[in-house]
Amino acid sequence: MKLILTAAVENLGAPGEIVEVKDGYGRNYLLPRGLAIVATRGAEKQIEGIKRAQEARAIRDLDHAREIRTQLEELKDVNVPVKTSESGKLFGSVSAEDIVNAVAAAGGPKLDKRIVVLPKGLVKKTGNYQVELKLHADVIGKVNFSVVAA
């Protein structure tokens, strides 16, 4: 039986792949669970169209990530103001959200806090730090920021 997978199936394939399976496995497991559809000419053409659209979207996402990385490289003064003691220790620590807000305040792009990769150990003192931003699987941006007393 020829099927088109709609979801990843272990030891069988990824979504969009056309696979040949035994009739019982297809009828009793894959089709009822919505993991596959019967391969017809129309379904194959539809899957090809979806794959082309996904490839085009991936290229656009990669180009957009590169543009954001360029904008981040142009940023100069990214300051994260925090409450500190007289000795320079922070009350708390600097979070990913603090960094994203500081980048936006410095004129950079608006970012999602989930892409921020904080340096090893928490930022607990004032000073200069560097953080990586995972903009895309193939694009990593870096931002230098200063933690200053508020």
Curated annotation (Swiss-Prot):
GO CC terms, sorted: ribonucleoprotein complex; ribosome
SUPFAM superfamilies: L9 N-domain-like, Ribosomal protein L9 C-domain
GO molecular function per UniProt: rRNA binding; structural constituent of ribosome
Keywords, in A-Z order: Ribonucleoprotein, Ribosomal protein, RNA-binding, rRNA-binding
GO biological process, one term: translation
Function comment: Binds to the 23S rRNA.
Assigned protein family: Belongs to the bacterial ribosomal protein bL9 family.
UniProt name for this protein: Large ribosomal subunit protein bL9
Organism: Corynebacterium aurimucosum (strain ATCC 700975 / DSM 44827 / CIP 107346 / CN-1) (Corynebacterium nigricans)
Gene name as annotated: rplI
